[in-house]
């Protein structure tokens, strides 16, 4: 719950915290690549005011991959087929580079027909400023701050006879 409370507080607020059950890792065979794929973290929870349970799938990603959204969709489809429950997919990107914002959707379509649009929640640590989490008592914040970035502010002041200039550069 600490992870959700830190990064997805609105969603965390809808979960009954007494209902969280972590499930065993799921293994799938990728018949195209001939590899075994593992769903890293899967939890079953109840949402406040509902009797039915949902699944939360958290997939850590330590390297940038263009096919990651597609892979996460495949995991989603297989989990949905097996469990027949609503699934809240979350990716946590812990890579240092690239610094560009990661893609958080996978689409299949044609110019006049959108067949599929799969979206997922994403926490991209290199897009977060560690200083924003410094005063949090959440242990997850302490553990992940090393992978976060620092937004650096440089103030340059040049004083010349007769006038002064100040410029601000954000890196």
Identify the residue ranges that each predicted region occupies.
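Conserved single-residue anchors adjacent to enzymatic active/cofactor-binding motifs
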Residues: 1-171
């Amino acid at each position: 719950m600490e992870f959700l409370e830190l990064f997805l507080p609105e969603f965390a607020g809808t979960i009954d915290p007494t209902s969280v059950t972590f499930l065993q890792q799921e293994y799938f065979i990728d018949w195209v690549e001939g590899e075994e794929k593992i769903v890293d973290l899967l939890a079953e929870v109840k949402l406040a005011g509902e009797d039915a349970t949902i699944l939360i799938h958290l997939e850590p990603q330590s390297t940038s991959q263009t096919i990651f959204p597609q892979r996460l969709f495949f995991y989603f489809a297989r989990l949905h087929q097996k469990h027949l429950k609503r699934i809240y997919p979350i990716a946590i990107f812990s890579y240092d580079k690239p610094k560009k914002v990661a893609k958080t959707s996978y689409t299949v379509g044609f110019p006049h027909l959108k067949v599929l649009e799969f979206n997922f929640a994403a926490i991209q640590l290199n897009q977060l400023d560690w200083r924003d989490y410094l005063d949090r008592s959440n242990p997850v914040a302490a553990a992940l701050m090393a992978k976060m970035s620092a937004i650096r502010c440089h103030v340059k002041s040049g004083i010349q006879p007769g006038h002064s200039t100040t410029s601000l550069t954000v890196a």
